[in-house]
Amino acid sequence: MEACFWQPGPLLAVPPAPPAATTPSPAGLQGGGPLSVQPLKAWQLPLLQDAAYDDLIPLLQRALLLQGPERLLHSLAPRPSLAPEVLVAHRDPQQPLGVVVSERCNRSGSCWQLQHLRSGDACLQAGEAGRMAIEAALVRAAIQRSRGAASWIASSANTDNVRLAALRQLGFQPLRRETLWRWEPPAEAAQLNPASLPSELQLTRLNRRSAATLWQLEQAVLPAQLRQLLDRSVDDLLDQSEQPSLMLVDANRRQAVAGARRLRLGQRPVV
């Protein structure tokens, strides 16, 4: 089970270049200066040697390459996100303690998501209090740096009490609980025969022409609060989907009655 949280974001303008966030060194981490949270630099990438970061390295490399173009292009016009924002926490720049990866959920930038929040070995050895302090500093800095965000969304496993407590301390409110399933189709999956469908139903692929039909269905079934938080447009739905994505359309009413979308990698908040 996973718990999904949201938090209202800053409604006032955020300074164009906020200073690096610093907090006193968390209990359990001896020596060094105050905790600092700053954008990840290219020279810091080889320092992320902990196993906790292994699966993030390709994403972090992409972020370093595309963060500049992402900021420039988004300032010119609403468009899908090219790369996430990556912040790193440290007392000594040569010894990263944790990383947070966040990204816009929509073209407008009104909703952001925490994609990854990872703690290194040194942070974990500091105990729960040390880990909570570092992760809280990372999330707080990510929220402060976002421009125009009206809401933030994060998810956490129900069993991770430290993560849940940290999110609650930062003002995140429980939104809903989900059960995640992993489906592994057989090697020779049966193919759907469109002729077997009722005559009034048409199997339609998601594309720019049909996207509005599926968007209307999703808007109708989403809880009102979640619909408001996500602030998703038709373009956002297309940006976040890839093929195969299909829907069943009632030809008489010209409405989608069912649909399944394949999400692009990283579109779901997985902290």
Write out the residue ranges for each language-model feature:
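Surface-exposed interaction/gating patches
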Residues: 184-253, 257-261, 267
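Conserved active-site alpha-helix within GNAT-family acetyltransferase domains
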Residues: 158-176
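Conserved acetyl-CoA-binding loop-helix of GNAT-fold acetyltransferases
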Residues: 125-144, 165, 169
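Conserved catalytic-core motifs of GNAT/GCN5-like acyltransferases
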Residues: 173-186
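Short hydrophobic/aromatic beta-strand or adjacent loop that forms the aromatic wall/cage
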Residues: 84, 176-178, 243
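Conserved GNAT acetyl-CoA-binding A-motif
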Residues: 146-157
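Short amphipathic alpha-helix that is part of the acyltransferase structural core
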Residues: 2-70, 194-229
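Conserved donor-binding loop and adjoining core beta-sheet/short helix segment
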Residues: 63-136, 250-271
